[in-house]
Amino acid sequence: MNRRLGSTEAIYYLLDTLYCLNFVVFVEMDGTLERANLDRALQAAQQEKPLLRARIAQVDGHPFFEAVPMEQAPLKAQVQTLRNWRLRLAEQLDTPFTGEAPLARFFWFGGRGGQSVAAMVFHHAIADGKSGAQVLVDALRRAGGEDLPVTLQAARPSAQDLDPINSKGVVESTVQKLGFWLGQGRATLKFAQQLPGYDPQLQAQRSIKAIPYTVSKEKGRALLAACRAHDTTVHGVLGAAQILAINSECGAPEERHLALNSLADLRGVLRDNLSADDLGLYIATLTTVHAVGASPDLWQLAKSIKSELSSLLHSGDANLIHSFYPRASLLPTSRHSARLVQAAAALGPPASMLTNIGNLQPLTLRNGVPIRSLAFMVSPPPQHPICVTVAGYAGGLHLHLLYDQTKLGDAQAQRIGNALIGFIDAAIDPSNPSEKP
């Protein structure tokens, strides 16, 4: 496990020294599990996944993953009452890790009536939403009595080390990088508009709040069918709904450019056939800028989002967004370095953020306890007024709109969220016009 952090991991690690970048994945269940079984399941997870028993050490001023004996850093279930569990999970988004192992936490919220919530909080440098959800689900399956084999998984290289661009010649890879950054420059020249009145600068204090929304199984299936009929994706239509919700806050209808920051899963384009079972940070933050007319069409916008993201992913360029942090000359760990990285990250077009970990099939544990829902939340970067997280489960969608209360008012955040859901409902029901929630 002992290796230097890759560029993406190092960026997230440095930014985490400025503002907490945790994410949490959680499930709601109709039943309970024994604490001893949970602890054994978490021990098995640590045996399998080297990053769950690693700390971030400083070697010559640079961050390295360093293995720690499991007995020195066991991952144990923290048991709490069910009351106010959502509030306490939101607080975890702003409760930093120290860099010591384990770089994850497990919470069990239980109460009367048999309902419970299981959650895992991750330091973002060791995982992304997709792989974090897989760790949680496997732990619950084991705790529920399923005899999953414990297979030691070798530590995976960073996203940069698995990028196919490394197998190209110097000239070819340089041309590819140049083309990518020219494209980013063209996107910047479209002058995307920021949410009026929003200050993207990092503030001394943060107060993260999450607003949950649910799209039912029936509506989720109808939305998927509508996406297929319009030759786009669920992420495309969710992104379009989000852009139009922001657009509704921008004053009188007129043509303007708005941007969307999508966290894209890179497992399909990196080497080594990675899957969700490979714990790690294998995502790219991709910003696309879109023209929004005075009478915008949701489906046209959804197709544009799908097309631009697909082009970046299939061209092999998606991972290059983090190449502004060169591997050969990694910045030393310091608040000054972190501020330089934050300043570079903030140079992109002003955008809201959308991250979607895909769909999980319905699951009932071996002991008969059904999982009712799966969702996740992430601490929003300061340059984005809102961050919307999406997890599909059993055909439905579980969304959270996250924002910093010190920078965005509760009423406006609620208004944006309600508009977003309104546009989703309009996409499902053809009798509703797509330009109004």
Predicted feature descriptions by range:
Residues 1-60, 80-104, 248-437:
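Acyl-thioester-dependent acyl-group transfer interface
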Residues 66-67, 212, 355:
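ATP-dependent carboxylate/phosphate-activation module, predominantly the ATP-grasp catalytic core
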